[in-house]
Amino acid sequence: MSGKRLVGFGAGLGLLQTSQTSPVNLEYVVDGTPGLAGSSVGGFTVYSPDRLTSERDRVTVIIYANTPPSVAAIAKQLSALGYRLGKNYIDSSLLHFETISPRLASLGLQPCRDRFNRCRALSLYSNVPNMTQIAGTWLMVELLEYCRSIHGDIAECGVFKGGNAFVVLNTCDVARQRPYHLLDSFAGFDKLSDCDPQQRAIDFRDVSFSQVSDIFANFQNVVLHKGLFEETLPRLEERKYSFVYMDCDLYEPTKALLEYFWGRLSPGGCVMLHDCWQPPAGAPAHVPTAFTGTLRALREFLPKDTEVLSFPETTHALVFKR
């Protein structure tokens, strides 16, 4: 990184996740959250972004943000201060590519930088908001490429506004060539169990089913299933699946999905789950409470000797059916 001093922008979950897998010797962190300046997060002192005004020629800024819209918003702030991508700032997804690629190669996958770059560009610059981490969407694309020879449909459970699926479908021909099932209530959470963070109960209600439907109108193999999983799963036509992506955040829905799809997953197929990450103890109060029900459901469902591959950079877990 050109030998300059390194500074982080963003003192939330993105910083905590990346510091576990891609530790970087940051000098300090900036964050515009009111009241955060002067505190310490992950061992780093937090300052106001104003500090960067006079630092442009002396530092390289790394954007630590979980969602592409947040990355884009920070990049806009940096551009207004005269910073330029690749010259004196990058985003942490580029670090994630470097740490995840060798792990995928060790599993027999062939990670591709061109696919990563396309996922990154679509996530940041398309009109469809993607709320999945850039590297997480790319990881899904690489797994779909790996499952090219596996028989079966594709399912994505937990769609929100459709951004992740939109990027995947525009990057990966495997996704376009097979039935691609999108399952969601398209109305936010129904109810939370005792092991889910109660303060997240109102999340994901800002969504319009008709708008999501319009996004995928020109993808002939995309099928949308609207409703709670306990309502839609019994109505699904009996199919085999090569790949299932689960991003429903909560314990009970994840449990229901695992019970339904695992028996219908073809040998060699893959289940990919989001929010399978345990945040470090003592996370700052401003950091949203992590969803922990997904990890609990996975641990309860699988036999104890089942290999689960963890990618804390993006809070994903992978399970292949052997």
Locations of regions flagged by a protein language model:
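Hydrophobic, well-ordered beta-alpha structural blocks that scaffold small-molecule cofactor pockets
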Residues: M1-R115, C119-S126, N130, M140-C147
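S-adenosylmethionine/decaboxylated-SAM
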Residues: L104-L107, R113-V128, V141, R148-R322
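N-terminal pre-P-loop "Q-motif" helix
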Residues: A135-L139
